[in-house]
Amino acid sequence: MYYPFVRKALFQLDPERAHEVTFQQLRRVTGTPLEMLVRQKVPARPVTCMGLTFKNPLGLAAGLDKNGECIDALGAMGFGSIEIGTVTPRPQPGNDKPRIFRLVDAEGLINRMGFNNHGVDNLVENVKKAHFDGVLGINIGKNKDTPVEHGKDDYLICMEKVYPYAGYIAINISSPNTPGLRTLQYGEALDDLLSGIKNKQLELQQKHQKYVPVAVKIAPDLLPEELIQVADSLVRHNIDGVIATNTTLDRSLVQGMKHCDETGGLSGRPLQLKSTEIIRMLSAELNGRLPIIGVGGIDSVIAAREKIAAGASLVQIYSGFIFKGPPLIKEIVTHI
């Protein structure tokens, strides 16, 4: 009930400042008795996916808690899973500010953050302190100054460090805000990356005596023939899941709106139909051979159900959470 008032205050601020203020407060309560202030009871809706049991099918998408600073406070709100990151081997500042823009009328966001984060070592220390009893995903990427042809090395470094602490690992090769990153979704570059990741996963399984599934996060801007090739590569390399989708470069639904021409990835409601269509095509191509985590514009129970009807086993929210707040979590988990 209170969130519309909180949102009104936060939306008076620059989007990144609003995020900082929110996280300052969440950091104060996380891991303390004050967590009760953000806790909400949601029904159990267990789902098995990638060999893991999720308390419910709703997760927080990567990008909100990049450094894993507020895992427990976010978990208290009722998420079945939380995906932290994207994290890179070394800390990096990301792109110049301003780098995130609200399209309020469209309930969308455009961001060009550029993987700003404190580095994988810092994230691991934060994860060690967390007590979240859901599934923790860790989303990994490459540093901006790492040449794309050496990008695989960055993913393997991050995998090595997060493996003991992750419920699953997400491979982000689809952000539009790191130059050249999306080229890793195609042909030989994708095969080489997936081969290296699978070998590292099996090596780490032996080392730690546990299997941590790996999911690859893809873009919504792939052509149908490109999507078929991606699906084929994921199956051939025995990848455990696919996260569909990241943000889009397509501005067709927001033409004429304030900030619509800002560089970056568009998320929120304008992405809803596009991401659902990708899930539908991907599901038809995969035919149950690996699960899909659906994300992109989910802002209601109906939007979540549409993703599942299209073929997703789990769903995630981000922009919808910014616009609708914690009540959206309870609403989706209760009625999905």
From Swiss-Prot:
GO MF annotations, alphabetized: dihydroorotate dehydrogenase (quinone) activity
Transmembrane regions listed in the UniProt entry: none
Chief place where the protein resides: membrane
Pathway annotation from the record: Pyrimidine metabolism; UMP biosynthesis via de novo pathway; orotate from (S)-dihydroorotate (quinone route): step 1/1
CDD domains the record matches: DHOD_2_like (cd04738)
Catalysed reactions listed for this entry: (S)-dihydroorotate + a quinone = orotate + a quinol
UniProt name for this protein: Dihydroorotate dehydrogenase (quinone)
Native source species: Klebsiella pneumoniae (strain 342)
